[in-house]
Amino acid sequence: MIQVLLVTLCLAAFPYQGSSIILDSGNVNDYEVVYPRKVTALPKGAVQPKYEDTMQYEFKVNGEPVVLHLEKNKGLFSEDYSETHYSPDGREITTYPSIEDHCYYRGRIQNDADSTASISACNGLKGHFKLQGEMYLIEPLKLPDSEAHAVYKYENIEKEDEAPKMCGVTQTNWKSDEPIKKASQLVVTPEEQRYLNTKKYIELVIVADNVMVKKYTSNSTAIRTRIYACVNTLNLIYRAFNIYIALIGLEIWSNRDLINVQSASSVTLDLFGTWRETVLLRHKRHDNAQLLTGINFDGDTVGLAYVGSMCDPKRSAGIIQDHNKLDVMVAIAMAHELGHDLGINHDGNQCNCGGNPCIMSATLNFEPVYRFSDCSRDEHWRYLIDNRPPCILNKPSITDIVSPPVCGNYFVEVGEECDCGLPAHCQNPCCDAATCKLRPETQCEDGECCEQCQFTRAGTECRAARSECDIAESCTGQSAECPTDDFQRNGQPCLNNNGYCYNGTCPILTNQCISFFGSSATVAPDVCFDFNLQGQGNFYCRRERARIFPCAPQDKKCGRLFCVKGPIGNTISCQSTSSQSDLDIGMVDLGTKCGDGRVCNSNRQCVDVNTAY
């Protein structure tokens, strides 16, 4: 028998106050004081945990009763979540804190289908919720021996800086109506639809730089709390794409920065990506890393990321300026940059997300936004279908979730066969939401080889070959998962011996020129590649931090790519391309044939194909 325990904190709700008040979010001109009433349902005789898996609070907003339903974000941290900081003498200190009973929740408002909530219950209720299409914030009032909270609209916060905030990614906007038309008519095969429907998981590392440490007066608890709140909101936003984000690591550069963090965002992103590839990945497994910095980037830029780079060792990264007192605004900037990593471009004027500003607008708006546009959805789907980033299909092991298992949190944990959320939210006919067990006569609930709750017939293609260097995978008939992506051996000749296979592709100079300059483009004469011997400007083979290194004569076709657009006349026109936001754009792809029996390796050297792999 379940006994309902009503814990009444206070039934009063005071009207809006006449004077302004200074809260954590800034100076608020119009607010309401409420005393939330907590309703707890526990079995008779049960011991109440510090932070329950589900909670319900009642209070009034604008004189109307509001019921806030909360459920703990159980997948917020991975089992091997770690925190790294540095001693005054520079020693790395890594700990694995126990965070099973954390206090971060997502939720909704009762009887409001479009509502959302992201709340920290660590010390009172702090966070934000969407009610009847409007964004409200809630936080405890710092009064002794009081449970009073302030509730206020985002629009009632005095803005310290009215300048528009920008994403530093350039040249990604829709150029005309035509791409939008194509995106809205995206047609997928049944195999591709199964892939799109499959849950995706991103294991995230966040790095706080030394300026952040100074900004928060070396208070690691304050930094940790801010980042946890951001990731909690990030999860809420990406649920629309069936993507679940687990924080696997937090690194705080407490002693000094480990890269040269500077106001030039493109340089900082390049340095951070290189550090991620050469340092972070070697001691911490993860899918994506974001740098949260206290420095002010040049102009109005508050974030930058590579586009279409998820799972790439260097480029699966982004940088975010800690530009706003509100956690939610920083989280939205992080969601925007992560969207670029997931292949999403900036929205054009004809992109729509229901009349509100959208996540992928090039200008970060003055109000919190949660929705991706129709353009973003189709752009993301196209990226997934074309690139199949492998790391986001790695389901966390059922033992990898930090918190004790709970049915209804969307993560399959010990003792569960499926988890489609709470019964009121579950839309999966294969799963019994009340027990987190598969329904009778069903074999699966999700996966590229799961169709109508049954394993797909053996031999059914679940991942098509993307090139002659790739291998198609087929369902086994014994599992809901598509077998591991495999491809032809590296170094195998391809495209009529014009190239050699490399990680499932056949990179050749001609196709790289066409991708940059159009179908009439061809590879430039050898004399153009002599620019790479100079080691100046954009013409080089290797780059380490701020230094660039010229190509050796035998390696010149492994540096900057040179092309000719259109027929070659009497005058040689050497064309190349580069990008401030991604310094690797315009370089010859790794694995490209640079001579008979020779390919470009990771050091941009032209080496024997038999020894390269």
From Swiss-Prot:
Disulfide topology: 311-391, 351-375, 353-358, 407-436, 418-431, 420-426, 430-453, 444-450, 449-475, 462-482, 469-501, 494-506, 513-563, 528-574, 541-551, 558-600, 594-606
Expression tissues: Expressed by the venom gland.
SMART domains (UniProt xref): ACR, DISIN
Superkingdom per UniProt: Eukaryota
Glycoprotein recorded as keyword: yes
Propiece residue ranges: 21-190
Short motif (D/ECD-tripeptide): ranges: 468-470
GO MF term (any one): toxin activity
Cofactor details (free text): Binds 1 zinc ion per subunit.
EC number: 3.4.24.-
Binding locations of Ca(2+) 2: 406, 409, 411, 413, 416, 419
GO annotation, cellular component aspect: extracellular region; plasma membrane
Gene3D superfamilies: Collagenase (Catalytic Domain) (3.40.390.10), Disintegrin domain (4.10.70.10)
Function: Snake venom metalloproteinase that impairs hemostasis in the envenomed animal.
Name by which UniProt lists this protein: Zinc metalloproteinase-disintegrin-like VMP-III
Species annotation: Agkistrodon piscivorus leucostoma (Western cottonmouth)
